[in-house]
């Protein structure tokens, strides 16, 4: 009897019975062979001209040795040229010795395309697989991009470059098209924070009332009041700019100066000032309530709409504190203190962005701008190059004429207006060369602006459809299911705990009964 020990594996009775290593997911097997393939004997464990039987995800095929020999660098080519069964097992997932069949737990659809590659030498792209899954399958089987057919190579490379940011395509990737799972997961994580918080259930309901207009009837009423206050604030700012109010404030300021008082506190109309105070009080209440009810303070300050709320009310309180600290003398010394109030009034216009909570179009526009920074950068680059070139040409052609083209920086305004096809007409060329330059500037602007705008418009359409689909899913969802989700976050009920205990006891009993010796099942081939 001959006994060998190779890499920790015991081989006994070399010419009669061989105990082979345990395959992946199976039992240790025994087989009878004529000779053992030693590393120095040069004897192969299977014939070199023997066909290779493979099973890929349930698809069984038989490949000829001649076809595999044409591509020795591929996985199946290396499997065909394997010098030992141990080496072959490293290249597959499992091996059926009775059928002499190699099993691969891979995509069966790609395997059919792989068979076509071994017949023709060209690999074609599968539309059923995304580019990344297709690339992973190709790398696993030992195929590179050079194996792609000429008809599919350009399309594959283009899709691979544009797939991570393909916001204008109707793909099925969760990150770009179907945000519902991600957004629902975010909501669940936020709601889970209330489980261990004090008065968590009450805070959670109030937070949902303020953040979700469709949550309940009080949330709809709160949303209507918030929109009304925002519109009233914007209307007050617009009314304040009317000439009659400006004249009234100017007269009040002159009277205050004549009386020896600071004119800063009497410039506002009393009605508009009261309306402004009411809006500020509501905005302050809204911001403070959201901050107190927010499940995460860090996430609250990272939300763009919350930052807009804070920036809108903060200048008012800073101006109020400065006025109280400086008094009348400070107001006279720092005459520009009123400009801070003007800045506050200007920043109030950003309150209109709060309407994005209730507008699908505004949310789609924000998402489009967020994911179109590359296109916007390209657009600005094109405009900068075009304005610089045509401004220099217009300056050269019109510098002798007194029409406003005195310097190249002065021509930048004309170039920007012309390239964007606005055409105010305040500065126009008068010479033939200047008019030709203006014609080129206008035509170039049409071409330059149109190219990125098309991509941005496609992205906006994509995000708009996605937001509409999400809103439809939220409207059609059962309110009782959402209540069940909220109840599940509070904790497991006593009935659920009792059921889990009974299930655990039954499982332990089943485990005790299953400890009896039995014949291990044979692995099944799919």
Swiss-Prot record:
* One GO BP: potassium ion transmembrane transport
Topology feature Cytoplasmic, residues:
1-217, 294-304, 359-373, 465-526
Q: Which residues form a coiled coil?
A: none
Q: Where are the transmembrane segments?
A: 218-239, 271-293, 305-322, 338-358, 374-395, 436-464
Q: Which domain of life is it from?
A: Eukaryota
Residues in the bilayer without spanning it:
409-420, 421-428
Amino acid composition bias (Polar residues), ranges on this chain: 505-517
| Annotated compartments | Cell membrane
How this chain sits in the membrane, per its record, is: Multi-pass membrane protein
The alphabetized UniProt keywords are: Cell membrane, Ion channel, Ion transport, Membrane, Potassium, Potassium channel, Potassium transport, Transmembrane, Transmembrane helix, Transport, Voltage-gated channel
What Gene Ontology molecular-function terms does this entry list?
Answer: potassium channel regulator activity; voltage-gated potassium channel activity
Tell me which SUPFAM superfamilies the record gives.
POZ domain (SSF54695), Voltage-gated potassium channels (SSF81324)
Motif, Selectivity filter: chain positions: 421-426
| One GO CC annotation | perinuclear region of cytoplasm
List the InterPro entries hit by this protein, alphabetically.
BTB/POZ_dom (IPR000210), Ion_trans_dom (IPR005821), K_chnl_volt-dep_Kv (IPR003968), K_chnl_volt-dep_Kv5/Kv9 (IPR003971), SKP1/BTB/POZ_sf (IPR011333), T1-type_BTB (IPR003131), VG_K_chnl (IPR028325), Volt_channel_dom_sf (IPR027359)
Region feature Disordered, mapped onto this chain? 493-526
Ranges facing Extracellular side:
240-270, 323-337, 396-408, 429-435
What tissue expression does the UniProt record report for this protein? Detected in all tissues tested with the exception of skeletal muscle. Highly expressed in adult and fetal brain, fetal kidney and lung, and adult prostate and testis.
What the record says about family reads: Belongs to the potassium channel family. S (TC 1.A.1.2) subfamily. Kv9.1/KCNS1 sub-subfamily.
Tell me, how does this one assemble? Answer: Heterotetramer with KCNB1. Heterotetramer with KCNB2. Does not form homomultimers.
Q: What is the role of this chain?
A: Potassium channel regulatory subunit that modulate the delayed rectifier voltage-gated potassium channel activity of KCNB1 and KCNB2 by altering their kinetics, expression levels, and shifting the half-inactivation potential to more polarized values. While it does not form functional channels on its own, it can form functional heterotetrameric channels with KCNB1 and KCNB2. Each regulatory subunit has unique regulatory properties that can lead to extensive inhibition, significant changes in kinetics, and/or substantial shifts in the voltage dependencies of the inactivation process.
Free-text domain note: The transmembrane segment S4 functions as a voltage-sensor and is characterized by a series of positively charged amino acids at every third position. Channel opening and closing is effected by a conformation change that affects the position and orientation of the voltage-sensor paddle formed by S3 and S4 within the membrane. A transmembrane electric field that is positive inside would push the positively charged S4 segment outwards, thereby opening the pore, while a field that is negative inside would pull the S4 segment inwards and close the pore.
Recorded protein name is Delayed-rectifier potassium channel regulatory subunit KCNS1
The species is Homo sapiens
Q: What is the lineage of its organism?
A: Eukaryota, Metazoa, Chordata, Craniata, Vertebrata
């Amino acid at each position: 009897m001959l006994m060998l020990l190779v890499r920790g594996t015991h081989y006994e009775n070399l010419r009669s019975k061989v105990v082979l290593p345990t395959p992946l997911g199976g039992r240790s097997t025994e087989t009878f062979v004529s000779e053992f393939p030693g590393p120095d004997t040069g004897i192969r464990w299977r014939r070199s001209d023997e066909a290779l039987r493979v099973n890929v995800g349930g698809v069984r095929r038989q490949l000829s040795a001649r076809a595999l020999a044409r591509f020795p660098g591929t996985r199946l080519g290396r499997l065909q040229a394997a010098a030992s069964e141990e080496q072959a097992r490293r290249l597959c997932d499992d091996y059926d010795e009775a059928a002499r069949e190699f099993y691969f737990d891979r995509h069966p659809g790609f395997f059919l395309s792989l068979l076509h590659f071994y017949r023709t030498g060209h690999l074609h792209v599968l539309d059923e697989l995304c580019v990344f899954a297709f690339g992973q399958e190709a790398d696993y089987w030992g195929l590179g991009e050079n194996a792609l057919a000429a008809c599919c190579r350009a399309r594959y490379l283009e899709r691979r470059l544009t797939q991570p940011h393909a916001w204008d395509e109707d793909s099925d990737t969760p990150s770009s098209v179907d945000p519902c799972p991600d957004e629902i997961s975010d909501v669940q994580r936020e709601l889970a924070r209330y489980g261990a918080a004090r008065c968590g259930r009450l805070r959670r309901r109030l937070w949902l009332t303020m953040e979700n207009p469709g949550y309940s009837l009080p949330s709809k009423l709160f949303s209507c009041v918030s929109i009304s206050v925002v519109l009233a604030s914007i209307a007050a700012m617009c009314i304040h700019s009317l000439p009659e109010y400006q004249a009234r404030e100017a007269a009040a300021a002159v009277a205050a100066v004549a009386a020896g008082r600071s004119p800063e506190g009497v410039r506002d109309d009393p009605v508009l000032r009261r309306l402004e105070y009411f809006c500020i009080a509501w905005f302050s209440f809204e911001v403070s309530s959201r901050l107190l009810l927010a499940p995460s303070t860090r996430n609250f300050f990272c939300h763009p709409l919350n930052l807009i709320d804070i920036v809108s009310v903060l200048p008012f309180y800073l101006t109020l504190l400065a006025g109280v600290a400086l008094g009348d003398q400070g107001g006279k010394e720092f005459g520009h203190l009123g400009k801070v109030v003007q800045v506050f009034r200007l920043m109030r216009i950003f309150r209109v962005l709060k309407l994005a909570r209730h507008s699908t179009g505004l949310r789609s526009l924000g998402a489009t701008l967020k994911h179109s920074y590359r296109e916007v950068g390209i657009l600005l680059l094109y405009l900068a190059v075009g304005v610089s070139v045509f401004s220099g040409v217009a300056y050269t052609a019109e510098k002798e004429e007194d029409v406003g083209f005195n310097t190249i920086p002065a021509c930048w305004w004309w170039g920007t207006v012309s390239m964007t096809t606005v055409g105010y007409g305040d500065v126009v060329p008068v010479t033939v060369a200047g008019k030709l330059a203006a014609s080129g500037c206008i035509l170039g602007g049409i071409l330059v602006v149109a190219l990125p705008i098309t991509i941005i418009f496609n992205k906006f359409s994509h995000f708009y459809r996605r937001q509409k689909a999400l809103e439809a899913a939220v409207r059609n969802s059962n309110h009782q299911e959402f209540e069940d989700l909220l109840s599940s976050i509070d904790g497991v009920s006593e009935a659920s705990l009792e059921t889990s205990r009974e299930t655990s006891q039954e499982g332990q009993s089943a485990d005790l009964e299953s400890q009896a010796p039995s014949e291990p099942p044979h692995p099944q081939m799919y």
